[in-house]
Each structure stands twice: as C-alpha cells, then as structure tokens.
Amino acid sequence: MGGWALDLGTTNTGLACWDEANGQPQLVELPRICRRPRSDDPLEAPTLVPTVVEVLSATSLLDRLGAWPPLERWMLRGRTALIGRPALDRNQALASPAFVPAFKAALAVEPLRPLGRVGRQLITARRAARAFLRELLAEVKRETGRRIRDLVVTVPVDAYEGYRAQLEEILRSLGVRRLRFLDEPLAAALGYGLGLVSERNVMVVDIGGGTMNVALVRLRAGGLRQGRAEVLAKQGRACGGNAVDSWVLDHVCRRMGCAVDALSEQEEVRLWRRMMLAEACRVKEAVFFLPSAEFLLTPPGLSRRVRAGAPGSQAALLSRDDLVEVLREGGFYASLSASVEQVLSEGPGGPIPTDDVHDILMVGGSTLLPGVFPLLEQRFGRHRVRAWQPFEAVAFGAASFAADRYVPHDYIVHDYAFVTHDARTRDPVYTVVVPRGTRFPTSHDFWKARLVPTCSLGEPETLFKLVVCEIGRTEGSGRRFVWDAAGDLYKIGGKTGTDGRLVVPLNESNPTLGRLDPPHSPRDRRPRLEVSFGVDRDRWLTATVLDLQTGRTLMDRQAVVRLL
C-alpha cells in the first residue's frame, strides 16, 4: 500500500491508498468502524466511515498516557473516542452529551464552537475533529500495521485557509510528516479519469447527506501541481439526503395515519423518530434499484392499527414513483435545476455557455436519487456526465495524486458496441468497436470489418443503419452505477449487483443511415460494406463506410455519437 488519501466528508469519510499490485486506487476497509462491513447494503459503500465521534473520559493510565501530545507524534496508544459505526450504535437510543454527529462545517468557520461536552469539559469542533482523526489513524495502524506518515487530504474548493491550517496542525500533531491538500473537484476529476493536459471547465454536482453543492471550476495542468482549482461559480443549498429522509418519513407517517413530532422533548418520541429516520433512509436507498420497498419499523401500537385496517391507516410501502413525488414536492429537483442555472449565469465574464462546460462530475450518495442523472443528462448530454462511482471518485483521485499515478491523457471510460443482427436468428449482436480505456484521438479506421446486410424482411435491402450502444460493465469484484436509456439506475458487479453488463442504446431511435444503390439481395451472402470506426479529438465516434460492390465511399468520417 502507498499513496494514502483522506476524503473527510460531512457525513462519511473515505480513506484510500494506491494498490501497487493492481495498479489502481482502493478504499481501505476498517471493519470495526466502517458503515456496514460485509452487509447487504444496497449501495455497497461499506468501506466508508461515518463522520461521527463520541469523546471518552480518559479513565485508564494507558488512555491518559496515550493522549499526551508529545507521545502521539510517535505512537497512538489507548483510546480517546469512539468513531464511526460504534459511535452511531452506542448513541442510537439515547445520545450522550459527548456524542458529536457532525463537526466539519463548524471546523471550517468556527473551530472553537462547542458541539458537546464530556464531564465538565466542552467539546469544540477542533477537539471533535482531532479525536476523530486520531482514532481513524490508530485504527489504520491496528488493521494494517502501518502508520500514515504521508497523506493527501481533500478539501472543499472554497475552504478558508483557516480550515486547512486546522487540519494541518491536527494531523502533524498526530505524526503525519508530509501533508498535501487537494481541492475536491480536482480530486473528483482525477478519480473519474480526466486528463488535465489542456484547460477544461468542469461542473461538480456534490449532493451528500447535508448539502447540495454545485461548483463550476476551471482545471489546468499547473493547478494540478499545486492541488488547486480555479472557482468560476458555486451554489450551495441545505438540501441533501438527510432532508430527503425527513420527507420520506413524513410521507410514510401520513400514509400510516400517524405522526412523530420532530420537535418533541419526550425522549421516547425522539428515540422513535431517530430510528424511523434510519428506516426511511434504508427504504429510500432500496427503491433506487427496486420498484418498491416496505417500511418495516412502526411505533408501538400502530402496527396493530394497520393490520386491523383502522381508518386512515395503511401498510407503509414506498415505491420509486412515491419517492420521485416526494422529491418534487420537497423542491429537490427545482433546487438542483436552479443551482445549475445560477452557476452557469454567474461566470466571471458573464454567463457561461453550456457548450463551454466540458464535463459534469457526480459526487456523493444522494446523486443516486431517482431523477438526478436524467436531469443532468437532458441538460448537458450523456457524453458529459460521469457518475459511476460517486462514493469513491474523490478518494480515488486523491490516492492517485498521492502516488503520482494519475492519468495524464483522456481515455474512453465505457465500452461502445456496434449493433448488427444474426443472419439466422435475427437476434442483436453487440460488437465492441471502442473498448474502455482507449486513448483518443484514434485513427479513422481504429476498428474495421466487412459486413453483409441483414435483409431482415427477406427483401432486397436499400438502407443500412449504424446503431451504437454503451455497455456498462465492471472488472473484478468492484461495482459501478449505470443508468439505462429510461433513466433507471442499475448496479453492475459487486456482491448484489447485476452480473455481466448493461447495454444502453445511444442512437437507436435516430440511427445514422446510408443508402445502398443498387439494393442488396438477401440471397447474396458476400460482404457488401466495409465499415470503419474511429474517435476524433472531441470524443465523437466517426464512421467511414465503403460500398464494396460499387467502390463508392458512402460515409467519410461521419460523426455518429459522442462518447464518454
């Protein structure tokens, strides 16, 4: 392992490193503190660590000695806090005053703001951050046997220098000797495989648990060396996954004919609301992939009313259509559209044309909500939206940066296939003409083959059409998120995802057409067309078609579809 990188998120934290054996970044799994190790988590993001902390009172001699600052630079002994899943589990029923569910936002602007207390001592944002990072580094040592001495940390693109200074002071006091910072949009660009040889404008849509942030940044090779991106415009709204959980819970409660008061001072009511919010999150994530899911947790007594068919109550089933309606009623889609349009309108020299935005990067688990990808696809085109690893992109990019292994040039990130039909069965045949990982531009005849027109109706063929599909697949045990032409989300690979591949037609409804003159007889099984495909510098798949019977060139490097 090498090239350590930390993506400190508001809700979840990812720790990644560069795997020399496989030549790629990987998230480090810390089973004792991560989300749901080896579970049936529908999103399969178990290696993320919840960014929560409960500060403990130092009771034992080892704990007190381990918290001595001069010693912490050299070794991390004892335990000063619970972090991640153990902290969540311990505070699920009754939250301790020493439990801090979020500290990143306060650390950025008010590091001395009290967020809790342990005994008579206040827990400031800075103390909470230090306790979390200390235990995270200690867990890495326990799990891998290695101390992290060289680390890249991702930071929000508009983070104040004070935020960087706070993190630097904390991490250096914990024994990190070489520390570098990398702007999150730049890390996401590297994680999604963007080459930064030339200047490009990138829009990062980051929707996490707490916020919806849309940033338009300009990336340059020089900025990569410094780990910085130039911010052209940014919009932030308090509209993330946590708000959606509340909307889902309210929707389900209305359907069941009950209410759980969010402002109640009664501990039992607050406990039930916390538990039901967690269930709302589970159901919400389940319908990312399923048509519907049942809400399994109900307050005492209500289950009997539902089973008895009490007036105003019914089983708590949430469908994907229900979730879309909840998002619409809550203003989620309107907020996203408004943020995108406002960012485009606030360029430093005036409005920025859509064509000048080269890439759209989706970051954060809430970008998987129904309707988000289709909204961006419709606005910018499928060929610009990179969305297959919203949880890992920032951490992967930072690990690549840490190991100095980022890709200097652009490459094609999906397989693209040319669709033909079997002469006997008429079934579609998908032949990959541009494999994933291809650098571009290529030669105009990067792929070439001689083809026989199908004559599917048994009559002379007068037309030929070029239909191209995107093929979503993954390698090894990893998983990717892929959207089909209807905008539905699929998980490819992983433990519970779809096996094999997902084929997405790109131009089936409007294929590139050519005419055969004279028509091709169905009895003639000799090749009639020589078809060549290539990729130009703008990622257009181009086609050259030669009529072998007449010797005429029917197409000469004609653009077919835009690739990603």
Over which residues does each language-model region extend?
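Conserved phosphate-binding catalytic cores of ATP/NTP-utilizing and phosphoryl-transfer enzymes
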Residues: 1, 179-207, 393-408
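Gly/Thr-rich phosphate-binding beta-strand-loop-beta motif of the actin/hexokinase/Hsp70
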Residues: 1-25, 195-229, 362, 525-548
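Short glycine-rich, Thr/Ser-proximal phosphate-binding strand/loop in the N-terminal lobe
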Residues: 17-54, 221-250, 551-564
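Phosphate-binding loop and its immediate beta->loop->alpha context
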Residues: 31-174, 246-293
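Gly/charged contiguous loops adjacent to phosphate- or pyrophosphate-bearing nucleotide/cofactor binding elements
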Residues: 87-100, 104-107, 114, 118-119, ...
